Amino acid sequence: MGSISPQKPPHAILVPYPAQGHVNPLMQLGKLLHARGFYITFVNTEHNHRRLIRSRGQEFIDGLPDFKFEAIPDGLPYTDRDATQHVPSLSDSTRKHCLAPFIDLIAKLKASPDVPPITCIISDGVMAFAIDAARHFGILEIQFWTTSACGFMAYLHHIELVRRGIVPFKDESFLHDGTLDQPVDFIPGMPNMKLRDMPSFIRVTDVNDIMFDFLGSEAHKSLKADAIILNTFDELEQEVLDAIAARYSKNIYTVGPFILLEKGIPEIKSKAFRSSLWKEDLSCLEWLDKREPDSVVYVNYGCVTTITNEQLNEFAWGLANSKHPFLWIVRPDVVMGESAVLPEEFYEEIKDRGLLVSWVPQDRVLQHPAVGVFLSHCGWNSTIECISGGKPMICWPFFAEQQTNCKYACDVWKTGVELSTNLKREELVSIIKEMMETEIGRERRRRAVEWRKKAEEAISVGGVSYNNFDTFIKEVILQQQTQ
């Protein structure tokens, strides 16, 4: 790889979408680049900047001499602490309001004698306004799609669904009349798909729906970037990656899983950076240490999934009645519009085998030998961490491309099983027992371990992702710096 001078380090500006599952992988990328000698400016929205101060402390935001944090407004009400939990409002607001303040920030950084010249901007794939800002200043712009490759490809086909007259649906009867079982046979590299396996944002009766329009347009706009990087590895999604390269762009770099690549970072100060927007409860790790290998059901719905109180109780009694130990993440805002309340008899039932906490260091949990299965919403961050940990999945997708990831986990990678949307406790008991006690579960676990080994091979020295990351730095970023 090309050498980097400490006197003239390349300067990368990183811009995540303001949600936990997007901030995490951008932070991992920032640490990887910082370890290679880059100066990093990490740009949060003001709302998330304040959340990081609450969860990590002011000293975290102060950063390091060569790893700095900045903030831009997202256009949402300053007084609403949970504003970024409503994804349509957040997406619409970032698209409309972030470009101008981001341009101002770049101008400020360019004028500052205290920071190196800007080499590149690496923005989240759904923060594509950064492409316009980069073009304004003549700066290299790289899009980081934090989805799976199959999720990215599905978003690129929103416009094709409209062209074929599939979307919009005439009314909401499509949700229950079998329409979602219609095959989708026109996406290259993604065979055996049905409409229900497509990202949930296609389920609209109006093509002007905020999220349908937002994801489709952001995906296509990202093709204008100088390069695209994905937190995946070739063998996991080879067919769809080949199709993306053939049809859209060859400047796509698979450089994951970051969670494993990050382990190779030398012991520098930025390696300890964690970007959780909630305070992480570390007591869960001691609790896991006392459990038998592969004995614990780990449950986490991600950072924005919300459920009803009725669903909360079905999950609670399903976990309790399975009789297996479980670690259950119950965010303070997980129940729509109210606090999560469970009956005293539930806590009495699970006191010796269940632990409920509000947030955990998930990467460490999924690497823990006590965890036997992960009940997940199938967000890509969680899915790739699960693959990296060699854990099978119980899939309960909520929205976005989680449905697509679920399809691949269950039918392609064969590491998962899917729960019904309208979950009942009896089904959860049955699925947990299947995954923890039967040959079906043992086979899913064997497959998960195989995928973990393949992921480790990809990021090892000489592996495909390792080499792709080197090539990305040398031929995309450093080549630009020397021009």
Curated annotation (Swiss-Prot):
Keyword Transmembrane helix set for record: no
Residues where UDP-alpha-D-glucose binds: T146, V360, Q362, H377, W380, N381, S382, E385, E401, Q402
Tissue: Expressed in the cortex, xylem and phloem parenchyma, and in specific cells in the endodermis of the petiole of the first unfolded leaf.
Record-listed E.C. numbers: 2.4.1.63
CDD domains: GT1_Gtf-like (cd03784)
Positions annotated as active site in the UniProt record: H22 (proton acceptor), D124 (charge relay)
The keyword Glycosyltransferase is assigned to this record: yes
GO molecular function: linamarin synthase activity
Chemical reaction(s) catalysed: 2-hydroxy-2-methylpropanenitrile + UDP-alpha-D-glucose = linamarin + UDP + H(+)
Biological process per Gene Ontology, one example term: defense response
Sorted UniProt keywords: Glycosyltransferase, Plant defense, Transferase
A Pfam match: UDPGT
Residues engaged in binding an anthocyanidin: H22, A400
Function: UDP-glucosyltransferase catalyzing in planta synthesis of cyanogenic glucosides. Able to glucosylate acetone cyanohydrin and 2-hydroxy-2-methylbutyronitrile, forming linamarin and lotaustralin. Also accepts, to some extent, a wide range of potential acceptor substrates, including simple alcohols, flavonoids, isoflavonoids and other hydroxynitriles such as p-hydroxymandelonitrile, mandelonitrile, (E)-4-hydroxy-2-methylbut-2-enenitrile and (E)- 2-(hydroxymethyl)but-2-enenitrile.
Assigned protein family: Belongs to the UDP-glycosyltransferase family.
Name recorded for this polypeptide: Linamarin synthase 1
The organism of origin for this protein: Manihot esculenta
